[in-house]
Amino acid sequence: MHRMVLSLLIILCSNFIFAQTDVLIRPPYLERGDTVMILAPAGIMKDTAAVEKGIALLEKWGLNYKLGKNLFKQNFHFAGTDAERLADMQQALDDDNIKAIWCARGGYGTVRIIDDIDFTRFKEHPKWVIGFSDITVLHSEIHKLGYETMHALMPLTYKPDEREQKKAVKSLKKGLFGRKLKYKISDSPYNREGEATGEVVGGNLSLLASMLGSKSQISTDGQILFL
């Protein structure tokens, strides 16, 4: 049941972070032949098979891939030291040939490097940043800079044989390649009728709470918050 709920959440939120307004800057959509970098800014990535499945998916879509130099490093429960994880993220942001950054997993650790990331090059050549869970830290920071990101599945959570995962993958592909997305959400007796307009922002509640009072704190004024 938990897995089903998580999969559904991924489907519904696969690109909720990027808003349907002209306020935020939208990175260029991907095209066949573009390169996606897989890296781990937080928890240790021991599951090489999961990365291989992610690579196979990218190749199926006609995309090239590059792995972070420190992707499989280990420093306690982190994917390498703070400096190593920061180096991979900075390289991906600065390399104009990298059109999207796909975080391999969440966990904990992105908040330890976020203040040291230089987004100068990213702002000149924005690219998609993809992930959920601990990657909420990146979503929040990049949103404050005025750019869209994608709250979507990651290699560690990718289970290609699960039906709900197939829906999530389809949603991710549509979002990355600029195809229209539609969502059907079941009604609930607890819903209140009404209309709301605004950018959809949010992510992992514990991460949003931990960033309160920091420069990465997400702005919810006039926004639609999803958790």
Where are these regions (language model features)?
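Short Gly/Thr/Asp-enriched flexible loops that form oxyanion-binding sites at enzyme active sites
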Residues: 107-124
